[in-house]
A protein has these predicted regions:
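C-terminal catalytic/acceptor-binding lobe
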Residues: 3-19, 215-294
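Short loop->beta transition adjacent to catalytic acidic/histidine clusters or analogous donor-positioning motifs
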Residues: 43-45, 68-78, 100-102
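N-proximal low-complexity "stem/linker" segments adjacent to membrane-targeting elements
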Residues: 2-67
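Catalytic phosphate/metal-binding cores of nucleic-acid and nucleotide-processing enzymes, i.e., regions
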Residues: 53-61, 95-96, 152, 168-169
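Conserved catalytic core of nucleotide-sugar-dependent glycosyltransferases
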Residues: 152-246
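Active-site-proximal specificity loops/subdomain of glycosyltransferases
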Residues: 91-142
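Short beta-strand-to-loop acidic/aromatic patch adjacent to the donor-nucleotide binding site
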Residues: 140-155
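A conserved acidic beta->alpha catalytic loop
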Residues: 55, 80-92, 110-112
Length: 294
């Protein structure tokens, strides 16, 4: 991807800079971060992610995994890669140590359908997500699993992720998705929106119009909201719940996965959307703004 972004833009779009806690919830947010750190320090976590043509964002993602993992007593990570034609395979090869950091590099000669909702795409994504799940199942037992995307431009807030750890530890949540911010180009100029609307199902499961989701900007620091499904490029799960699920490609793969967990007879608790766990997905670069119509 040939994107011209300045260092100042990158800094301005860090989640903690762009999306700070709402003044009403500053104290509650700080308490959740602190408790999340305490829980993490005695917990284990596995990070799993898909990767295809994830440059130039992949090194930042890997660095954030290291930074987040350092908050935990122990951590491991697994990348499921396929069909990259940029330097993604090379970066993952250098990163992997076949112990704590593992990568599966694959060439399936499948088309790159990054902006479609066809089953050709969703079935493949479900296959890759299930490979991640199998890796967790086959590995050492962990307390938590973090499922993430490897190509978010601004990455995620480590403190925000820790609030999900806190809410899961002291509440009845079996999993929490993230608030994923993006900026879209429109004829009227850039527009800030919620990203990953297709993965969201609030009180329903069937696919409906999700235009409303793009306007959903809940206050950072406010408490999680129960939803049937959501993702936002990063979600944290109790490991026992994560392993009960099974991805399928009938629609966005996260939806049947979350439904399979929710309907499992051994699942306790609920799933939700955490406004404090922030991911910055993408934005309109400064050089692109120069060409916006008046």
């Amino acid at each position: 991807m040939n994107v011209q972004i300045t260092p100042d833009e990158l800094y301005a779009h860090r989640p903690d800079v762009l999306l700070p806690p709402d003044p009403e919830f500053v104290e509650e947010y700080a308490q959740a971060v602190q408790f999340g750190r305490e829980v993490a320090s005695r917990s284990s976590i596995a990070f799993v992610f898909l990767a295809r043509n994830s440059m130039p964002w992949l090194p930042q993602t890997l660095a954030l995994i290291e930074q987040t993992g350092a908050c935990f007593e122990s951590w491991s990570a697994f990348a499921m890669e396929n069909d990259s034609v940029d330097s993604t395979k090379d970066v993952l090869t250098e990163w992997a140590d076949n112990r704590q950091r593992q990568a599966s590099l694959n060439t399936y000669a499948r088309p790159h359908l990054s902006h479609t909702m066809t089953q050709e795409r969703t079935v493949a994504l479900a296959e890759y997500r299930n490979a991640c799940r199998q890796w967790v199942q086959d590995g050492d037992s962990v307390d938590l699993v973090c499922v993430l995307d490897s190509d978010s431009w601004g990455g995620w807030s480590v403190d925000g992720l820790l609030t999900s750890v806190a809410h899961i530890a002291r509440g009845d949540w079996w999993g929490l998705a993230s608030y994923s911010w993006c900026e879209m180009n429109t004829p009227h100029g850039p527009y800030a929106a919620g990203y990953d609307a297709w993965a969201c199902r609030w009180t329903w499961w069937n696919q409906r119009s999700h235009d409303w989701f793009h306007h959903l900007h809940l206050p950072v620091g406010s408490r999680p909201v129960e939803m049937n499904s959501a993702f936002g490029q990063l979600a944290v799960y109790r490991a026992d719940a994560y392993l009960r699920g099974r991805y399928s490609g009938a629609t966005c793969e996260h939806v049947p996965y979350h439904r399979s967990i929710a309907e499992h007879p051994d699942t306790r608790g609920r799933f939700g959307f955490n406004p404090s766990s922030r991911v910055v997905s993408f934005w309109v670069p400064e050089h692109g703004r120069q060409h916006q119509p008046n």
